[in-house]
Amino acid sequence: MSFSGRRVSILRPRNASLSAPRGLSDNELRSETHRQFRDAHEGHRPHAGLDASRASTGVVWCTERASEHGYAEDPSGWANLGQGAPEADDGIEGSFPRPESIPITSAAREYGPTAGIKPLRAAVARLYNEHYRQGKESQYTWENVCIVPGGRAGLIRIAAILGNSYLSFPIPDYSAYNEMLSLFKNIAPIPMPLSQNDGYHIHADKIAEEIARGTQVLLTSNPRNPTGHFVGHDELAQIQDICRDRATLILDEFYGGYNYTTDCDGTTISGAENVVDVNQDDVLLIDGLTKRFRLPGWRIAWIVGPKEFVDALGSAGSYLDGGANVPFQEAAIPMLDPSLVRAEMKALQVHFREKRDFVVGRLREIGFRMDDVPQATFYIWLDLTSLDPPLPPQANISDGLNFFNALLSEKVIVVPGIFFDLNPAKRRDLFDSPCHHFVRLSYGPKMDVLKSGLDGIERVIKRARGQTEKPWEDDVAVQDD
């Protein structure tokens, strides 16, 4: 074959799929909503070399579907309870005002270090020592901190520097882990299903069992997205003792400030308190300005861990993301004064607990049992089968995908629970997923948005029960065949 012939065969692929599509179950075939979901995650590649499924996951998929019904043109007219973002305005009593402009020094015009500027790294280390390591001999320094352009960039850097590893992760958990775990071939992902019956608790003996089976890395959010629970201090210390010298523990602590269990006194949650030696314990902590400082647009986050890990993470930044924005790094330094942060966390906890209680109360009024009230984060992990009395079968909105789809008619966005069933190989039948009958609701937005969203949920439930004049067949909700 000539070289030109080979070139044509590459540039003009046949219409056949690059990989044979999996066979759908009868349940999935009968549901158009589920077929749409599969179409977004599997199928042919319209462009050579492009895997389009990686561009449509989790919140992005939900936003794309909402945009088909007008969300992109008028986002302020929607109640977006899907995106995991806290309200970013200055309206929270007791919270410090966010900068409306920042100075740009001459140094900030240059490339910054890929591990972050030293003053910010030192400020993060001081914050952790003041809040979690008082009286301990081993203290964090700037060399134990790597600044990264957002939490997901931090996770990608961590994944890039891991050796060939079995990595265990609980189900359910943060949806973005799914793509990260499937992207890196040095990682063999091992799911660790948790039980709804005991509140998705991560038991220390289960961690010991996973390590005994050969797990070298463990990854989890704590506090936990989407369930709103967390592993408490004593049990987390036990887990860290089990992992010490045996496995690397990665703790995604972005919701550590949203703690409602200590009477909103500003106490935050972190595994840093249980680290014995900051350079020997293989514990990586990820946090940043995004959630608890309510600055998601700044894209300033950090990883705290042993110096050798931090050195490798800084090197990975040179070929992955180039590092975080220097002017925003400089502006972040005064925000990390330990006493200021304590006061900020107290204000945050009081405000978001009030919103949590409002949302839980409204959901109970609508008919959801709400036996499982979140201890942390700003999420409700809503069991659609907990409605009392149950919905009639013909309503067909007792699974997360169809419930999400029905809410589009009310300009309300939630995230179907299926996205938190981390399933990198995409083998599982959607109807077999333990997360299939859940949705995640965020009470991150302002109160008026929460009220609007819950009003929309109530109307959908009433319509499903036949309690409104509007027929169920509307112009948005997709009907099953």
Please report, for each region that a protein language model flagged, where it lies by residue.
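N-terminal mitochondrial targeting presequence
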Residues: 1-24
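Conserved core segment of the aminotransferase class I/II
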Residues: 7, 33-37, 123, 127, ...
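N-terminal small-domain helix-loop-helix segment of the aminotransferase-like
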Residues: 30-149, 336-340, 464, 471-473, ...
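Short beta-strand
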Residues: 78-80, 286, 369-375
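Conserved core of the PLP fold type I
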Residues: 105-244, 256-278, 284, 372, ...
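PLP-dependent enzyme catalytic core of the Aspartate aminotransferase-like
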Residues: 126, 279, 406-415, 420-481
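Conserved glycine-rich beta-strand-loop-beta hairpin in the small C-terminal domain of fold type I
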Residues: 349-360, 370-387
